[in-house]
């Protein structure tokens, strides 16, 4: 529900905003432990490797991401988001190491429910957007894409867009 969405939003922000993302070992899945000494328990890395192998095998299969959302209580969806975002960070290292941060404006009825920005380095651009404050217009259990966004949209100023006619979207990562 809402907690899952908030957690995933925080993960994506942590991994795409300026700075170095920091993860506690073992927090790649949902972690409901409290503070010290609970967070000092041994981490089951074999389990995480096994889950990641399974997700890599299933990647691209029809309905894979939808099943991650449906079964989000397992926590695999968080590991999936970390894995895919780390792939993007590796592929576009210069953007995250040296790139600019450009906040984007959002307009429309639910404008306060989206945080959006671009990261830019030279001719390379990455855009990130996450939902927030969903309880007022989205039913518990739905995925953000199923919310009633109405006329809400992200404003892309012409100065913030690539000028090259060869600029293409490399892909989107969203959940149902």
Where are the regions that the model predicts?
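Carbohydrate-interacting/catalytic domains
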Residues: 1-176
């Amino acid at each position: 529900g809402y907690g899952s969405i908030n957690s995933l939003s925080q993960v994506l922000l942590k991994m795409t905003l300026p700075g170095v993302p920091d993860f506690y070992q073992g927090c790649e899945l949902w972690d409901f432990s409290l503070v010290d000494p609970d967070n000092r328990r041994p981490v089951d890395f074999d389990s995480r490797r096994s889950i990641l192998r399974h997700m890599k095998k299933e990647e691209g299969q029809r309905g894979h991401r939808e099943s991650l959302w449906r079964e989000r209580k397992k926590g695999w969806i968080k590991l999936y988001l970390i894995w895919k975002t780390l792939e993007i960070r590796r592929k576009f290292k210069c953007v995250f190491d040296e790139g600019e941060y450009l906040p984007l404006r959002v307009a429309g009825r639910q404008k306060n429910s989206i945080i959006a920005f671009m990261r830019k380095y030279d001719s390379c651009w990455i855009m990130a957007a996450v939902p927030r404050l969903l309880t007022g217009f989205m039913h518990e259990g739905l995925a953000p894409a199923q919310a009633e966004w109405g006329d809400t949209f992200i404003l892309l100023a012409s100065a913030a867009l690539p000028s090259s006619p060869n600029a293409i979207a490399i892909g989107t990562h969203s959940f149902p």
